[in-house]
């Protein structure tokens, strides 16, 4: 079984989402299906069809979360040692062309959230940064073409 690297924060969020889905969302959708069933003919009952679709989405997400949680390898980011970029690193980079600075934490694929600067370890940028150190230049193939960055700092916080 392949382990999925995850921060403690990411693991907790997955557990919380699973708990909400199983204890709140699933019962609500079962209730909605029962209500829609009571309206008669199911073949033309849009309310019923919608509720069944929602149930399918919820059950699929529950299965996905249970699988991820069972395969999770929780990594204490603060205990990671070394100067090179690994899972859990908080990295500040500078775009060599625009001079724009950005900071990201490299996290597992289930906890990536670009709005909160959490970058999936499977993303092209993260893959290009892994193994590099401060002050190194790195070139990344992006949808906009080849981008060049300078690594300003690497921290494990």
List each language-model region with its residue ranges.
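Residue-level signal for pocket-adjacent positions within structured domains
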Residues: 1, 16, 37, 43, ...
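N-terminal cationic and glycine-rich segments that engage phosphates or anionic surfaces
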Residues: 1-63
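Short hydrophobic/aromatic patches at helix-to-coil boundaries
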Residues: 3, 154-157
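Amphipathic alpha-helical coiled-coil segments
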Residues: 59-73
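Non-DNA-binding regulatory cores of transcription-related proteins
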Residues: 75-149, 155
């Amino acid at each position: 079984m392949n382990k999925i690297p995850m921060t403690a924060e990411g693991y907790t969020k997955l557990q919380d989402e699973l708990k909400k889905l199983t204890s709140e969302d699933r019962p609500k959708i079962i209730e909605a299906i029962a209500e829609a069933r009571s309206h008669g003919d199911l073949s033309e009952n849009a309310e019923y069809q919608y509720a069944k679709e929602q149930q399918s989405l919820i059950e699929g997400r529950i299965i996905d979360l249970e699988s991820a949680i069972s395969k999770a390898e929780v990594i204490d980011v603060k205990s990671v040692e070394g100067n090179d970029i690994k899972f859990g690193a908080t990295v500040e980079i500078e775009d060599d062309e625009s001079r724009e600075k950005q900071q990201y934490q490299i996290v597992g694929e289930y906890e990536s959230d670009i709005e909160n600067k959490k970058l999936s370890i499977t993303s092209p940028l993260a893959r290009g940064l892994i193994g590099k150190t401060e002050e190194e230049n790195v070139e990344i193939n992006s949808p906009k073409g080849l981008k060049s960055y300078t690594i300003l700092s690497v921290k494990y916080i």
